[in-house]
Amino acid sequence: HNTKRGNMRFLLLIVSFFVFAQLTSAQTVNPDYDSTLAKKLGADDYGMKSYVFVILKTGSNTTTDKAFIDSCFSGHMANIVRLVNEGKLIVAGPLGKNDNTYRGIFIFNVNTIEEARKLVETDPAVNSKLLEADLYNWYGSAALPEYLETALKIGKYKIN
């Protein structure tokens, strides 16, 4: 009986050693690692960070008042530009037609859903219930905000 227990402990020790060895060998140091850039972007050891991902969907307001709708969506676009300029919004764009009434996405460069919710509430299309927002914590590359500099240079027409 004690021999079985001793053999199990030995087996567990051997398995633990191999699991630990595998985990530590899987973490190869990146020779291109730039600690200054990683710190500037808020990256963790894997080059990742937390964001808030938002799915915008058709809201409960079914008005057909074109002037009202145009005004709200003009404000929606102006709000997007403002949030991008403040460094809070790093991805925004419409989705193609779909059966889920999903209209677009946002990715906010903030850590909490509460922070993102306050930013979403500044959107006239959301406030008027033309759009509704579902917010999710998302873990992605800390380099994501870096694409904005290039994105602003490749569009022939300015979004305003």
Spans of features found by a protein language model:
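Bacterial Sec-dependent N-terminal signal peptides
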Residues: 1-29
